[in-house]
Every structure is written in structure tokens, then in C-alpha cells.
A protein has these predicted regions:
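P-loop (Walker A) phosphate-binding loop of NTP-binding proteins
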Residues: 19
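Walker A/P-loop
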Residues: 25
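NTP-dependent small-molecule kinase module
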Residues: 2-9, 34, 146-211
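Hydrophobic anchor at the beta1->P-loop junction of P-loop NTPases
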Residues: 16
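A glycine- and Lys/Arg-enriched "phosphate-lid" helix/loop adjacent to the NTP-binding pocket
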Residues: 103-149
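ATP-binding Walker
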Residues: 22
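ATP-dependent small-molecule kinase phosphotransfer cores
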Residues: 41-91, 95-102, 126-127
């Protein structure tokens, strides 16, 4: 008999971060359904704001303006209502985005190795930063891993994503959210315990002096 996994109660934005091909969109859509939250795709929001595809935004305006637009969109989204938000690839590298995420969101890094990323991204034409032949794509992925993984490591939760069914990854994410909130609650109780003890001691001392 398969037991149904209890869903955590989430009252803030869940921000999925990671490199292109880490599964932010596919995992995010299913996670949002499980948690009864809306799903927002950062890349699609960038395309909507620009009125162009990601490839055309990069082609017409260059990487600097592409990143600036990405940062503006993420700033708006991170000030919004609770949802599951798949970040634009690379957006978490921006300091402003990371700061806002730490204030307003629970950040989850979908961490994948280079072989998984390559398998999921090779030959895809919608990813403007990963265009080229197979060797070029692999070299670019390795470069992004080296440059960006230190930023992603600042996320609240890290979930390793492998070449497995999306539903399995979603279960890992939900279990990690449960664990994160349980740990945070235990820490909060420990921090409050000394205050309660001191309060009890003060009350006892006060009663003793009145006798």
C-alpha cells in the first residue's frame, strides 16, 4: 500500500534555482500542483516583458541588457504572492536577486551534474546561452558550473536531480521542504526555551519575596 505524502504548508514564494536543464520548469509545475500554488516561469515572464523570445532578446540587445531585464523581472516576481517560481537560468547570480530571495522566498537549488545537464539541453534551440555543437555546449555547461554553483550554494535547500522521473524529484523536493521547516521549528523552540525558563524563574523569585 502506497501512503500519500503529506504536503507542507507553504506561505511564501518557493524559488527554484539552478542551471539550464536542472529541471526547474518541469519540477516546478508538478510541485505547484502538489502544493496548490500557482506556477510562474521566470523565462516566460522575461519573454512577455520584452515581447520577444529569449534568443531574440539576447540577439537584439546583448547579454548585459538581457541580464538587466531578467533582474527587473525577478525583482517584480519576488515581491509577489506565494507561488512556485522557476528562476531564469543565471538570475540567482545577481546580488539583488539573491538578497530579495533570502528575504521573500524559500530557495531550492536543483543541483545536477554535467552529464544530466548535457543530456537535457543538447540540441535545444530555445536556450540562448547554450547554442552550438555538442562539444561547445558541454564546455559552456562546465564553465557555468564553475562560475555559478558557488552562488547556488547559498540556497536554503539543495536537492540533487538525476536522470529520473520528474515525480521522483518532486517527492525529494517535498521531503526536503518538510525537513527544512521541521529543523527551523526545532531551532525556534530551542531559542525560546531559555526565555521561558527565565520568565518562570523571575515569577518564582517574585512570589518568594512577597511571602
Amino acid at each position: 500500500m502506497v501512503t500519500k505524502m503529506k504536503m507542507p504548508k507553504v506561505d511564501k514564494i518557493i524559488l527554484l534555482v539552478g542551471l539550464m536543464g536542472s529541471g526547474k520548469t518541469s519540477v516546478g509545475k508538478r510541485l505547484a500542483r502538489k502544493l496548490s500554488l500557482p506556477f510562474v516561469d521566470g523565462d516566460q515572464e522575461i519573454e512577455k516583458a520584452a515581447g520577444l523570445s529569449l534568443v531574440d532578446v539576447l540577439k537584439c540587445f546583448g547579454e548585459q541588457e538581457y541580464r538587466a531585464g531578467e533582474e527587473r523581472v525577478m525583482k517584480r516576481l519576488l515581491k509577489g504572492a506565494p507561488c512556485v517560481l522557476a528562476s531564469g537560468g543565471g538570475s540567482f547570480v545577481a546580488e539583488q536577486t539573491r538578497t530579495l530571495a533570502k528575504e521573500n522566498a524559500l530557495t531550492i537549488w536543483l543541483k545536477a551534474d554535467i552529464n544530466t545537464l548535457y543530456h537535457r539541453t543538447a540540441g535545444r534551440t530555445r536556450r540562448p546561452f547554450l547554442l552550438g555543437d555538442n562539444e561547445t555546449v558541454k564546455n559552456k555547461l562546465q564553465k557555468y558550473i564553475t562560475e555559478e554553483y558557488p552562488y547556488y550554494s547559498e540556497a536554503d535547500i539543495v536537492v540533487e536531480t538525476r536522470d529520473e522521473r520528474v515525480e521522483n524529484t518532486v517527492r525529494h523536493v517535498i521531503a526536503a521542504i518538510h525537513k527544512f521547516y521541521h529543523k527551523a521549528e526545532k531551532k525556534k523552540r530551542r531559542e525560546n526555551a531559555p526565555e521561558q525558563q527565565n520568565g518562570g524563574a523571575d515569577a518564582s523569585a517574585g512570589n518568594h519575596s512577597e511571602c
